């Protein structure tokens, strides 16, 4: 009560922020007449003037009023569009490392031009981040004329672009691209082998569009660059045949409970567990298929990989549904983003799950991958010096933005008051009744000329509604991941009178639904439109626009509640843009996933007690409250998962930053010889310590072991035992010095042969490759540690503290291994004398010529052409890989002429 009273008197934090910013808006408005008097050249010249002032030490914040006034005036001249006062407020919020909540249709794209221009003046680059390539390209091309008018360069960063084009895009003042591409470029830059291969500059200012989608919905999904490991596709196929024999165990309180099943499914945590009965059956089936020996247990350490295959296959069959979680297109399993309904081409599930789904669908199984580099969006975006974002729905997640990203959320008021009617939810007993009610509502709305947008949470549901509409004879468009290319065109015309559009989740987000349809899209479809044609199109559009407004504006139908209230609000936000009329309603059933998993059983019990007849709906504040509570439960659970993921990833992130920083330093220097010398001393000291403990008696020394180790690991053949016999005065310290001196001498002789420059280049390459190889193994080890660390809780230990402690000791061990591997590799490298190299090269050329002649004798296309030619020449059978080579060298064929193929 007291807090409410204080807020009434002093205003909320949001009100105080906006009050402070409105004073700056008044200053910008006062500058408008002055800006209007400037010629185009004088307006363009302001950019150079601002940059000069910054170089002299002026603070960026001091330029806000004038810079925003310049952008507003330039926008009027280039686009014929003037920034509203609320857009100026939004621009200031975005410059202050905050999240700006701006409703759909309030012009977020135009608002973004203000902070983008201001922060680009520093010359350090601005990254505008969008959710897909289409929006990145659209926004870049739309805003390019404005920025170029003001003397700034614009770049677009798209997947598949060659490195030089990417470098050029990043060198621009303002770069547009997707969150995935920025993250992958960062990882690729940290795998580069020369400074020239890197494309990104230092990360300065990121302006994230649809910030909730990127920083919250996708926060649990790490970006991973992976490489293939050995082929195990056959095992996935064999295990996949077994899974259909297993029966799912239903809950005991459900109507379909039929005694004990073989596996149970936890839909909340998306996990599958074998029951005891299931374990017995699957072991029998594995033995029958010849995959496992009689009497063996699936849980024995020897079968750990087999258990991995069984779990992956079970999850693929029980938890992942075609046209909901993925689609199959051109013989390929493509993931569908659960948040946007869009396909994620090129993205694959890890831990063998993708291969298990491929086996289930009978498509070609691609190899499993090993992580080479990975980062979460949470940690990538926190690398920027300055981060800001905008969205239509952020207030529900304000706490998360604040606690994880240290970003405050400011709700920017709308330019015109919102008049959309949000109708109460209707709850039905069954899915079929709900779908029927939706069809009736659509018929009623379209009969009076009102356009309808139907939001579904999966492709499967969108196709179910589509089939029912087709049966009812209602014309409609479907907007889901299967029809990616037509997305913008369908959305643009979704505001036509009586138009019906079905959209999965938020597919098509970023394109406004204009009441009456988009006249711009109609003009764009004409080849060379005349002024008369354009006027006629505009006049026709105005008639349609007025008719739709009279019918009640765009009506939104939600076919079920999403896990997050924010995503429901995004769907609602498609209607009622810029003060237009509109309405929305959600239709639910007790069979919906959210209701089934999270709504208490008493809700369905209460509905039964009310004696509801088929087709009847319940509309009660209690039910609405129960649904809101269910959503809150899911949101808080998802927040905890993301928070926990971040706490664990922060440990890996500290190590990642240390490795990448070290790697970049290594890339930027040309001479690493000092580092090599320092490492050599450490490595030899540790190696000798293992066999000659410091300050120990000679009787405790293991000289044969030390000699063998030096020979095997460092190619250093030293007569240490002989030295000790011949030189009694040789003590521990002098012996250490002599071994190190000998290793340096051998290395210097190699350097004299190849030259210092070549040796420095080689040293750098070895260090980079060894670092990458060990870092890759370390990441895999960290993943394994992470998966099992929760079990430490049973021993009354804090899993997070244990993870920190163990990962730190693993990291320290990796750094020691790095030193050892580098010195071992450099010591073992064989350097040929120039004349030896020439002789070997001569032999190689002669063998290549001889092979070429032999290949001319044969016109076979297969890989055994050379072998067949040799067989023909010598009158012998076809030569096997392990047979002696027919050329008479005495070597095996695979090590002689077979190798040259």
From Swiss-Prot:
Zn(2+) binds at residues 885, 887, 896-897. It is a peripheral membrane protein. Its cofactor is Zn(2+). This is Protein translocase subunit SecA. GO terms for biological process: intracellular protein transmembrane transport; protein import; protein targeting; protein transport by the Sec complex. It comes from Shigella dysenteriae serotype 1 (strain Sd197). SMART domains: SecA_DEAD, SecA_PP_bind. The gene is secA. Belongs to the SecA family. The lineage of its organism: Bacteria, Pseudomonadati, Pseudomonadota, Gammaproteobacteria, Enterobacterales. It is an enzyme of class 7 (translocase). One of its GO terms (molecular function) is metal ion binding. Keywords: ATP-binding, Cell inner membrane, Cell membrane, Cytoplasm, Membrane, Metal-binding, Nucleotide-binding, Protein transport, Translocase, Translocation, Transport, Zinc. It holds the Pfam family SecA_DEAD. Induction: Repressed under conditions of excess protein secretion capacity and derepressed when protein secretion becomes limiting. This is regulated by SecM. InterPro entries: Helicase_ATP-bd, P-loop_NTPase, SEC_C_motif, SecA, SecA_CS, SecA_DEAD, SecA_motor_DEAD, SecA_preprotein_X-link_dom. Residues 859-901 are annotated as: Disordered. The keyword Cell inner membrane applies.
